[in-house]
C-alpha cells in the first residue's frame, strides 16, 4: 500500500504545474533585485485595484478576484506542461483572465494562485516567489497598456478580431519569456549552456502563443451567450460594453 501511495505521489509530482524559475538559478544577494521588481508590480496592481473599485464595486471585484484565483490554480495544477530549458512551458492564460475579469482581478488571481501553489504544493518555489510574481504581473500590465492602444473605445472585448487577440496573447507570453530570460541571464550569466537553455525555452513557448489566442477566442465566443449575466458583476464591464 505504501509503494502504491508513493507511486501516486510521484505521478502527481511529475504532472502538476509549477510556474517557477528553477531554484538556484537566481540566489544569494542577486535575489534582492526581485524584491524591488515585485514591490513595483504590487504597487501598480494596487493602483489598478483602486481604479477597478471606482468603476465597479467591492463585491464585483472580490468575486472576479476569487474566480481568477481559482482559475490560476487550475491552470497551474491541472493543465498539461513540460519542462524545457530554464523553466516549464505551460498555459497561464493571462490574456484570457484579463479579457474576462479585468486587469486588477487577474493580477490578484495570479499573485494569490502562485502563493497558494507555493505554500501547499511546491514549497521549494517560495524563495523565488518575488521573481515569479514579477514574471507574471509585469507582462499583464504591459498587455493592459497594449489593449488600450489597439482596441477602439467603442469595441467590447467579445467583438475582438483574431489579430487583436493574437497581439494581446503574444504580448503577454512574450513578456513572460523575456522575464524568464532576464532572470536566467542575471543569475547564471551568458555561458553557452545557459544561452541554449533560454533559447530552447523561448522557442518551445511559441506553441503557447499559437494555442492561447484560439482559447481566448473560444472563451469570448462563449461569453456572448452570457450577456444576461453582465450585471451580476462576475465579468469586467468591458467584456460586453464599450469603454
Q: What positions do the PLM features span?
A:
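Alpha-helical membrane-inserting segments
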Residues: 46, 71, 75-79, 97, ...
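Membrane-embedded alpha-helical hairpins and interfacial helices in multi-pass inner-membrane proteins
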Residues: 19-32, 149-235
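Short, Lys/Arg-enriched N-terminal segments with co-localized hydrophobic residues
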Residues: 1-18
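Short helix-perturbing small/polar motifs within transmembrane alpha-helices
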Residues: 37-49, 119, 125, 132-178
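Hydrophobic transmembrane alpha-helices
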Residues: 20-96
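Hydrophobic cores of alpha-helical transmembrane segments in multi-pass inner/ER membrane proteins
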Residues: 34-43, 95-107, 137-145, 205-217
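Alpha-helical membrane segments and adjacent membrane-interface helices in multi-pass membrane proteins
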Residues: 75-140
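Alpha-helical transmembrane segments of integral membrane proteins
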Residues: 26, 30-34, 60, 64-68, ...
Amino acid at each position: 500500500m505504501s509503494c502504491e501511495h508513493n507511486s501516486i505521489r510521484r505521478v502527481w509530482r511529475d504532472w502538476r504545474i509549477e510556474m517557477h524559475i528553477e531554484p538556484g538559478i537566481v540566489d544569494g544577494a542577486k535575489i534582492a533585485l526581485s524584491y524591488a521588481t515585485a514591490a513595483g508590480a504590487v504597487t501598480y496592481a494596487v493602483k489598478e485595484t483602486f481604479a477597478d473599485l471606482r468603476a465597479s464595486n467591492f463585491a464585483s471585484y472580490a468575486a472576479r478576484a476569487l474566480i481568477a484565483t481559482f482559475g490560476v490554480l487550475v491552470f497551474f495544477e491541472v493543465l498539461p506542461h513540460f519542462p524545457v530549458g530554464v523553466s516549464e512551458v505551460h498555459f497561464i492564460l493571462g490574456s484570457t483572465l484579463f479579457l474576462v475579469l479585468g486587469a486588477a482581478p487577474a493580477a490578484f488571481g495570479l499573485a494569490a494562485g502562485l502563493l497558494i501553489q507555493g505554500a501547499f504544493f511546491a514549497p521549494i518555489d517560495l524563495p523565488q516567489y518575488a521573481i515569479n510574481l514579477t514574471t507574471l504581473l509585469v507582462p499583464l500590465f504591459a498587455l493592459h497598456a497594449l489593449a488600450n492602444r489597439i482596441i477602439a473605445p467603442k469595441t467590447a472585448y467579445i467583438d475582438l478580431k483574431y489579430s487583436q487577440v493574437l497581439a494581446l496573447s503574444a504580448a503577454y507570453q512574450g513578456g513572460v519569456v523575456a522575464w524568464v530570460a532576464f532572470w536566467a541571464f542575471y543569475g547564471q550569466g551568458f555561458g553557452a549552456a545557459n544561452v541554449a537553455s533560454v533559447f530552447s525555452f523561448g522557442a518551445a513557448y511559441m506553441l503557447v502563443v499559437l494555442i492561447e489566442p484560439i482559447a481566448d477566442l473560444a472563451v469570448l465566443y462563449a461569453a456572448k451567450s452570457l450577456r444576461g449575466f453582465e450585471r451580476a458583476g462576475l465579468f469586467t464591464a468591458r467584456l460586453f460594453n464599450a469603454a
